[in-house]
Amino acid sequence: MTWTERVVEREGVRLVCRDWGGDGPTLVLLHGLAGHAGEWDALAGPLSSAYRVVAVDQRGQGASDRFPSDVSRDAFVEDVVAVADQLGLERVVLVGQSMGGHAAILTAARHPELVRALVVIEADVGGPDPEWPTHIRRWFDSWPAPFASRDAAVQFFGGGAIGMGWADGLEERGGQWWPRFDQDVMVQSVADAARHSFAHEWERVTCPTLLMLAQSSFISPARVDELMRRRVPTMSVSVRETRHDLHLEQPDIVYGLIAHFLADVSA
């Protein structure tokens, strides 16, 4: 299947979505920081054979408006609600990776009537961390952007499926390849998240939840155990030989885990 572009507007901010169509329960896919909806293409196609699938370019990223004035976590949550409302989506399954997973957790906690199930990929509720924005800015500063070619970008981002997934998020201008986001906006978004504690939000989530982790996860086993103790029902699974972007690295495995989880939810 192919996707259709859908545009949602909330408080003057345009949010661009890839609507893959499909029948059955609705899945809303949320990418991570500095990402784009196209990251989900390898998953969205197969998933749309059994589900309605919508992938969102979150505010400030991808094809959505690049300079929103509000990049608080509240804004990202209300964007998800607006996408569901304006596209007529009810009782959705939220699938989010990294910062998209964080937005998914907060949405499920604050809008339980909207979310029937939650798939969190390489994400945690987090907490105050004053060093995090500096770390992210240094990471962006390390990018040799603009890239001389798409191939150069693929190699910089590690090659293979992960490198291609990140390179697909760039845009070609004047023979060079540029990020489709503003670095300061992304750092500001992280800074907002780093100022607050969201631990209580995890315990407010009431829907069935799958926590999907990479073998080389930034979330420690002890932290996973804590999350599992604090909230039931939650399932966790670690995917062997994967890193943070496992949805790019092993989309077939991620697809199988999501499908199996949702079959149990529907049973």
Feature map (PLM): residue ranges:
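Conserved serine/cysteine hydrolase catalytic core
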Residues: Q176-R230, M235
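Catalytic histidine-centered segment of alpha/beta-hydrolase-like enzymes
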Residues: T242-P251, Y255
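Alpha/beta-hydrolase active-site loop signature
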Residues: A34, Q58-G62, V125, R243-L246
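Active-site glycine-rich loops that stabilize anionic/oxyanionic intermediates
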Residues: G24, G32-G35, S98
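Alpha/beta-hydrolase fold catalytic core
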Residues: M1-L27, S49-Y51, L89-E90, P233, ...
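Active-site loop/oxyanion-hole signature of alpha/beta-hydrolase fold enzymes
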Residues: E11-V13, D41-S48, V54-V95, M99, ...
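Flexible "cap/lid" loop of the alpha/beta hydrolase fold
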Residues: I105-A109, R116-P146
